[in-house]
Amino acid sequence: MKLKHLPFLAVGAALLSEGALADTEQAVHELAQGCYAIQSSVNGDYLKKFHKGGAIDDGLSYRFEDIQVSDAAHFFFKPTKFKHFLLTDKDGRYLASHLPAEISAGRYAGEFAEWEITAKDDGNGGYGFKFRGTGLDMGLKHNYSDGGLYFFDLLNPNNNDSEKKFKLVAQTDCTPFPEVTTNVTGDVNVLKGDVNDPIRGWADPHTHITSYEFMGGKFMHGDPFHRWGVEAALNDSSEIHGPNGSLDLIGNIYAYNDVNHRYNTEGWPNFPDWPAYNNLSHMGYYYKWMERAYLSGLRMVTAAIVENEVLCWAQSTINPGSWVNPNSCNIMDSIRLQVQRLNEMQDYIDAQSGGPGKGWFRLATSPAEARAIIADGKLAVVMGVEASETFDCGIKDQCNRNDVEDKLNELYDLGIRTIYPTHKFDNQLGGSRVENGFINVGQYLSAGRFFETKECDAHTHGAYFDSGFPLLGDVPFVSDILDIIGLNPTYDETIEHCNQHGLSGLGVYLVNRMIDKKMLIELDHLSADSATQVMDIIEARNYPGVITSHSWMNSGKNGSLHPNTERLFEVGGFGAPYNGNALQMESKVGRYLDIIEQTPYLNGVGIGSDMSGLGGQASPRSNADVDPLTYPFTNEFGFTFEQQVSGNRVFDLNADGIAHYGLLGDQIEDMRQRNSNRVYEAVMNSAEAFMQMWERAEAAPTTKYHDPLEAFVKIFNREANKCMDIPGEDNNLVNGANVQLYKCMDNSYDQQWIWNKEREMFENRADRSKCLDNRGQAYNGGEVVIWDCVDSDNLRWTYTNNVLASKHNPNIVADAYDTGNDGNVGQWEYHGAKWQQWELRPMSIEFKWVDWRDKRSGKCWTVQNGTAANGAKVILDSCAATDAQTWMYDPVKDRMHSALAGDFCMDIPNGNTSDGTQLQIWECQDGNPNQQFLKDSNRFYSVINGNKVIDASGEADGSPIVMWEHHGGNNQKWRASLH
């Protein structure tokens, strides 16, 4: 036997045999991107390709032979994930396996070409390596008596004369695995710095790195990374887009306004038609493209997880390519999957770079963590959510405060730090910024109604709307949807439209809880009213953690910034305009600076790319032909950039614009050379500005919950279980319009009223100039209508103990004549029956002073005798609008506060939840479980015992309020009412 080692290289030249490795796992990780020959540890033979015969893989396989290392197969080690590799020789053949259990020189990447590698210290300063085939889940063995490779041998069951640990000998002449190149040279160590120093570099707060998984994973073609490499990540898109893009219906409509647009779907290595700045349905974030941008000074990005249930449904319905194994269209499922993908991407890049923590792409969940990542010369990635029905709170969903709380906590625990309350469509959190055309069709499919609009105010630029859908009727699948809907909305085509819906009570709760958790609130995509109300909360709570990341807030008139955008900067929030080319960015960044420069905050403005999220990218500069960006160029960090090469395709900013994310690195240099110093410096200060904003948010003092919404109520009839309503769709508020009963609907504005106690009038939300009117008909059969809110007793009412009485005669009260939908509301002499009993139910109850009435009797929780002292008992009593009957529920601390003087809360004596234990009030104590009740729908559960609820022991005045086992009776159901 002749041993053939060069200088002894058990695991690879000087790199792996000098004792620099901390452990055997790191020895495996550091094989990444290496070039090695595989040597027998027993006889020194080397693995070599040979012609074995047969049809599989052209009859080529590998075996050990007594040869020099120069004649051996030299394998490039390409990681697929931690400790797993593809091994390719100089001819591009894979060390592979196939059924039943054979070795071959494979032609394709895949599980049968993937190897899990482990290492063991050989005791001589090196390592022996084991190879386990993923596809067969078997370990590789070498029979050194004949040179053969095998997994199992029926004729040699004891593996005699066999070994399973091998040496790796470093080489320098491997053919690299196919890969996109950054085409950037320089010392990456220059990106490192001191964590206490200001960050130099730019921020992109709006990326969609994982959008390849949204819309069921069947719309955005291409992956930012792939286990089997670029050939799989950026392959031909015809599988989901059809021949020549014929099935890319949504992409063609969005990008080209032409469902019949066609293009070449070929990807790697030629890329004839994609990626392109105006193509919306192909991935632009391949990790090597992102690495080029990172080398330009990109220091942080927000990875906005995007999903839209309606578009997902549409894509999975109309595109046959989506019918096989699509992802779930559920928003929360999609968010969880995309968070998983971001973690996998971090691990994949780490694997390429030599092991955990070695890569340049790092997820960050706090500003301190982000600063440490950046100081280490790496890219900080913050995770956010931009989805239409986050928390499963679409208009059609069953969604309540507990759902929002639980799922907000889940998202936080997943690492999410930024959230858009709305996106594209209205949801139960609030109204979204409205759009005409296809998005309005989606709004109907999502919410069951088209956008409900009003004329924008004097400060707000809105959208023009067409009645019907004149531009969409010829689009095949859209016309089918319109036929199914059978509706054509009518709009005033002469005005600018804004959404009439603002933030909901649930949205108010979300924003406050995000502030409590120091999360960052995104204002883009909110309706103007929603954004105003968010800013009201932000300002009231002195909280700076607010962002506009890609110019999707309403603008002001004549292209000016909206007052809400100005308010955002004035409180210390962060902004980034939607990206444009260098010429466009001068004004886009400049108008943000006009406001920021008047504040005490750092003059930093980011770039919001919104790539691969149904947003087009910057085209080439209009003067690029006469004044091009010249290649190569050296950026301010000393990196030299050549034109980017992906396979056979050369990308040039001057001709291609922002075709993929890597070309943002070229644009940064273009801005450096062509923009004013004011603008360029603001962009290069943007990562620091983002961090300072985030740090201010984390350091913000704890402040009280703030609700900016007016106290709208629904006037609820206890007999009919329906609400006062005006016939029509919030559009029939004319003098004399009859008041009727109808099923209570949270989004029906004409069912919502402001109880103006001073004027004793009920103003209707759909038209605040109209009030509930008794017509002066204080007699049996008198009408109840709406009328202009003039100074007249005809519009005045008194409200006491569930009774709405005419100001003209307190014995004449509002009466439900019929209990069905469209049942008439009139006036009748008081007799006390339930059809004369009305509750003023607030649209939200969190942190509001209300009384609580049981469904059975309509009577109120009452502190007995109004005694403001520890141990005072709680009873049921007729509602009389006293402090003893007034309570405020704190859903954050799960406490019910009494309005009596002092600071008292509902309390279970000694924590005794036995049936019949009477409740009391006691001095409020943080964290005391005796005072904690979970509100679920209309019940209050004790946190001590989830089977016990607050219960009215009787119907008579003075009946004790007790704890009792939940049975679902009406005496355990509680409704809030204003008084």
Q: Model-derived features: where do they sit?
A:
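Bacterial N-terminal signal peptides that target proteins for export
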Residues: 1-7
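Residue-level detector of alpha-helical hydrophobic segments embedded in or interacting with membranes
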Residues: 2, 185-186, 805
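Bacterial N-terminal signal peptides
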Residues: 7-15
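Extended, charged catalytic domains and RNA/DNA-binding interfaces, predominantly
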Residues: 171-707
